[in-house]
């Protein structure tokens, strides 16, 4: 599908570039300035400027351009071109809780090295661990706290032990259940750490900060649901000792402390 627009004569893709700011003229966006190869390049538009930097880089670029909360821009040393308090606000993110369990059988991806995975991928006709997206199964669940008939929890099953996003390699074999609350009430924000476009934006997620504490209650529900899943008969032949949390009989209070 990408060839339908990427090979168009109307499209120019510039790589190795960092957009520094949106160019404004009489309150209207007329283009962007970007850095490439140590030089600043001006790209002007005939119609519109579309920002597609996502939930973090789009508000960052707007604020670097002088569009955003006045006090924050002035504090960062950026001239206010258009005061807009909502820029960078209302950040919503899905906090994920992982439940890890040891496997009594060597059927997971924990012992698969990157090199071996690459060989297996080609030697097995593009099958095997190298063809996996790791999240082998997913589900949407409606918890007992759901206000309507829509699912409010999303789950993914991973046939490997993912501790700290996989950065911490645990010994042995195991599997992981990821669960998140789909409609969090906590709100965060994106801020500038510097007026330098090369500096990463500050992300204040403010997880579990809603005044009612509902997000935390839902994370407890996520953890309990994952344990309930691993207790099903389908896991009887594989179920080893629990890893995170270390016990399967934690009370709600203990789960709150774990979270």
Regions found by a protein language model. Name each.
Residues 18, 54-55:
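Short glycine-/small-residue-rich Rossmann-like dinucleotide-binding loops
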Residues 1-29, 33-37, 98-118, 246, ...:
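Conserved redox-cofactor binding core of oxidoreductases
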Residues 140-144, 158-163, 172-240:
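C-terminal segments that line or cap access tunnels to active or ligand-binding sites in enzymes
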Residues 40-42, 147-152, 187, 200:
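Short, mixed charged/polar active-site loops
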Residues 59, 69-171, 225-237, 245-247, ...:
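Mid-to-C-terminal "cap/lid" subdomains and adjacent gly/pro-rich loops that border
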Residues 48-49, 55-69:
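Alpha-helical support elements that line or immediately flank enzyme active sites
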Residues 38-53:
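Core beta-strand elements of the Rossmann-like FAD/NAD(P) dinucleotide-binding domain
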Residues 17, 95, 194-196:
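Short, small-residue-rich loop/turn micro-motifs
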